[in-house]
Amino acid sequence: MTTQQTPLDAPPRHTGEPGLPLASGRDTLRAAGAILPIVAQGVIARRRHVVALAGKADLDGRGVRVLQDLSTRYGHGPVRLRLPGRRAALVLDADDVRRILDETPEPFAPDTWEKRKALGQFQPHGVLVSHGEARAERRRFNEAVLDTGHPLHRNAAVMARAVAQEAGVLGAEMDRTGELDWDAFVRAWWRVVRRVVLGDGARDDHDLTDELTRLRNAANWSFLLPRRRARRERFRARVREHLERAEPGSLAEMIARTPADPEVDPVDQVPQWLFAYDPAGAVALRALAALVAHPAELTRAREEIGDRDLALPQDLPRLRATVLESVRLWPTTPLLLRETTRPVRWDGGELDARTAMIIPTWYLHRDGRTRADANRFDPQQWLDGAAQEDPALVPFSAGPGRCPGRELVLFTTSSFLAHLLRGRELELAAPVIDPQAPLPAGVDPFAVRLRVRPTG
């Protein structure tokens, strides 16, 4: 849990002139050097080889240390950066994070220029790249379909059966081979995702999600690549075919039943749900690795599972907390972006309109000067309320821009993990995680490997 929100030995802010602190050219380069490895690993789709290299070089950890030094030099921020052709400010203070996220979308809009260029590759009418009335309508539609705010989705019974069946297939493979790695895990995970979102008829449509991955890989380059319009239209046509079945129990059925304003474009909301579920798979596998490396937490998780009927929807608070802690330790959205829609007053100065606000969640979650648990596995904080009271912890963002699929993702991941844990002993083969040592700032999900022994 957290300690004080500011280090006791931090000097007062110094700006050099009236207004918010302005980083020197050298410090702007240092900030860029901390952030660019995060971007290079893939903001929209993870680049497997780059993630591996970043982990070996501890680039995430180095970035945390750089931003710690900058917060000491300039105060916690916002610290304006000297970027050519772009106003930008680095947000290093928890209270500033709270303000920005609470005041989304006005005056802190989530549809930044960079985000519009990136997500335009596969969801140009998605809620994340929308503003004004269009955003409000699309957000309302997303919340209705995703059943935002409810731990168990109204279609949870059908979804739980899909999870149980696919986890059963994966479990049988694990028991036969004696191991679990990323490739086996993600194949099963995508089958779950396609069934939950589009229905059983999409279970084996690997081409659909492969096409989305290609579009997301292009989106990693944001404005540097032209839009793949023909590919996007092929992808949309395929999504539309699945939606037309409106299979009972799927999100596709919810779409068919939910009134939509002409601004919404229901087909264009689906890519975001598929996109969000992809990193959720990495979150789940990291959570499983962390559990196996921490025997006491693993025992508590097994006790929660007990003899529950996992083919039925189950609320599993401890496993949900484990997933949340996995996102806290290794955020799937390491950078949150907002853009000011007008000049904004701040203590000590004013930010101009069209300033990009860069919230480095991977740093805020791991700042050991302000967090006693920065580098250890602590699911309990998600159960006792401590994490929810900390504005620096934003695993699914926060405020009006909070992920509308948070509960659905937590239900799906926790249920999937419960099935994999039942009836087998697991041992972490890679990476090496010592529960007595600080956890690494980066854990490559593609390299996670567990040994499996069935117990009956």
Predicted regions located by residue number:
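Cytochrome P450
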Residues: T2-I44, Y74-R80, R87-V91, D95-R98, ...
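Short, basic/low-complexity N-terminal boundary segments at the transition from targeting/disordered tails
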Residues: I44-V66, L324-R328
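Glycine-rich loop/turn
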Residues: G55-R86
